[in-house]
Structure formats: structure tokens, C-alpha cells
Amino acid sequence: MDRITIRGGNRLKGRLPISGAKNAALTLLPCSLLTAERLTLTNLPRLADVDSFGHLLNELGVSTTMSRGNGETIGRKLTMSAGTIASTVAPYDIVRKMRASILVLGPLVARAGEATVSLPGGCAIGNRPIDLHLKALEALGAEIELAAGYVKAIAPSGGLRGGRISFPVVSVGATENALMAAVLAQGETVMENAAREPEIVDLARCLVAMGAEIDGIGTDRLVVQGKTSLHGAEYEVMPDRIEAGSYACAAAITGGEIDLVGARTDDMEAILQGLRTAGVGIEPFDGGIRVTANGKLRPLTLSTAPFPAFPTDMQAQFMAMLAMADGTSVLTETIFENRYMHVPELTRMGADIQVHGRTAIVKGVDRIVGADVMATDLRASMSLVLAGLVAEGETRVHRVYHLDRGYERLEEKLSAVGADIERESDG
């Protein structure tokens, strides 16, 4: 098993290319199940979760061909073809590796008339039920069964039917599953209180490129006119706003200057505003965003919430950054109930953090010290890397397979902007 070793204290400076978005890619990949024609995705990141999803698609009968990307951006190109659906069963041994596997449920039941999917795995950051996914499919006429750790969805005779879906709470995954099912349902589907994340906008635009008819893209009300079939397309995966935000925090915590090549301000307003409030310079340029930090960081009060508010996927990284701020910050996690597992590891390095329910009180300190720390989930892992970049001495982050699920070539990218970081084997 690998570990990341960091010798802290270097000011980061240079150009850092932003990869295609993990969360968008995992939503776009199952679109291949919606058409018998070829779907090609470009700017696809090289990540463990993306590879696992590709194996799942192969299991379902999708043929895949990968080629390498060119230029400063590092995305790959994947061509997928699902002329026929060979299987409608997504087995446990693949699905257990990542929660996003549940996103084959909607496309399979929409095109093949049925789907059997193992209940998903992924990061252990709290109770993330799929009941909203299932209720959305039921609103389109699907019959749902739960047994032996699997969920089975069966379309009525003649296929799914358009309907009205009103989400009681905002759910990104349920919105994605419902949207992919609705594009092949008969008639009109209206989705109220739909999630508005940029990754959902990316999904909707890909579906439109495949022939879907969707109104209200980017709003919380989506209206879909179902089609009997979709055609193939080529679509570019959006840049990863969470990766960009994470490396912006790396510039901030080290007092550095990094050009985030490919990052888009429209996708990151809440993140960028948080950085500005903390005293970090943000300067958009043609093709990216420059992040500059000089002097002590200022404390913040932040709450996570669905887009366009501050994203839960940036909470851990901001916590690491604010551990070095001049004053006391207050972070409140409203999305997941168990997303402070990085706190004990940060405190072992000298951070002063107290958790009270969903709220964390972060008192800035002048120095933290390198240590052996254990990654617990994807974003928590990145917070430990950020702390290691500024810590005195050597930090070793163990169980970095979590990082490999969401950050492409992390140690290479950080090394290129001046970090003393390397991947080693735990032996």
C-alpha cells in the first residue's frame, strides 16, 4: 500500500493544469447506456473511480476504447459503445468500490426495462441513503424491490412514463439518476427542487448533445420531453472545480502563487469568495485562475450547502487552510453528519480544532508539525496533504488510495509547483 511523504515549508509557485471533473465524469459515463451509438468523452481524468466505473460498464456490455489526451490539459479520450445491453446486473464486487455505481440504475431501467444494482459503497462519510433515487424512478412508473443487498427496478410494460418528481431535499445523485431515466421516458417529466450543481449542468448538456430535450438547465426546475432513443455524441468533461479549489488552498496555505490552468470561475464562486474573504488574491485570466497569497490568512465563518453555496467537498480543505489563519473560524457541515474524520489527524499535527455536533471551531495556530497521519476519505485525505505542505518536518499520509479516487497525479502536479512530495510504498 502506498503513502505520500511531504517535507513541508516550500512556497508553491507555477502553472498547475486542472483535470476533468471526477464528479462529472462519473455522471457522464453511464450516459453510454442510453444509446446504441457511440458516446465519446474527452478530458476524462485518470482516476481509480473512473477506471472502476469503466469496469462496471464492461460488465454490462459496453465496449470501451481509451486514448491519451494531448497538450497542457491531461484528459484522456474514451469511446463507449453499448449496441446491446449484455447484462442488467451491477454486481457487488464492483459496486462496493464506489457509491457512484448507483447511477447505472436509471439508464438501465430506462433503456433495458430493468436493472439490478448492488447497494453502493464509496467514502465512509455518513448515512447517504438512496431512497430519493428510488422514489424518483417510482414516479416514472418503475416498480422497486429491495432484497439481499440489491435494489431491482422494473419498468412497466411499454417503458417508463413521464411524471412529476418533487425532491423533498436537494439530492445531486437522485437528480442525476432521474434525469437520465426521464430522457427515455414516454411524455413529459417535470422535476422540482432539482440539484443545480455544475456537474448536473454538464450531464444535461451531454444528454442534449445526444438528442435529449431538456428545459431549465441550471435551475431547480427541469422539464424533460422523453425520446424513444438517443444518438451518439462527443462531449468534453468539465474541469474539476473541487480539484481547482483544493490547489487554490495549497497556494493559500503556503503563501504561494499558482495559475490553475483550465479552472472556471462560474463553477467556483462560493469557493473563490471564501478565499477572497480569507485574504487570498483571486485573478481570473484567459483560460484559468491565478491564486496569490501574501501574509497571514484571515478567519472565516462558513456553512456547507447545495450549489451555489459553499460545497461540502471543500470543507476539509478549508479547515486545513484555516488552521493556520490569524483568528478563530467556524465551519458548519449541513450536508453529511460524519464529515469531520480528518479532525483528529489534523490535531495530531498541532491544529486547534474542536467539534460540537455539526460545527467545528478552528483556532488558528502559528505552526504545525509533520506526523504520520491516516487518510479516512477522499477530501479528508487532501486536507492532510495541505497540512503537510506547511508543516515543519516530514508528514506521511497513509492509505492514499482515497486520494487516487479523486486527484489525478497529485504528487506530480504539486512537485511541478515546488512541493517536496513523493509517493512511496508502505512495504
Swiss-Prot record:
Query: Under which name does UniProt file this protein?
Result: UDP-N-acetylglucosamine 1-carboxyvinyltransferase
The residue stretches assigned to a coiled coil in this entry are none
Q: Which family does it belong to?
A: Belongs to the EPSP synthase family. MurA subfamily.
* Lineage summary: Bacteria, Pseudomonadati, Pseudomonadota, Alphaproteobacteria, Sphingomonadales
Q: Which InterPro entries match?
A: Enolpyruvate_Tfrase_dom, Enolpyruvate_Tfrase_sf, MurA_subfamily, RNA3'P_cycl/enolpyr_Trfase_a/b, UDP_GlcNAc_COvinyl_MurA
Q: Where is the active site?
A: 123
Q: Which UniProt keywords apply?
A: Cell cycle, Cell division, Cell shape, Cell wall biogenesis/degradation, Cytoplasm, Peptidoglycan synthesis, Pyruvate, Transferase
Its biological purpose is as follows: Cell wall formation. Adds enolpyruvyl to UDP-N-acetylglucosamine.
Task: Name where it mostly resides.
Answer: cytoplasm
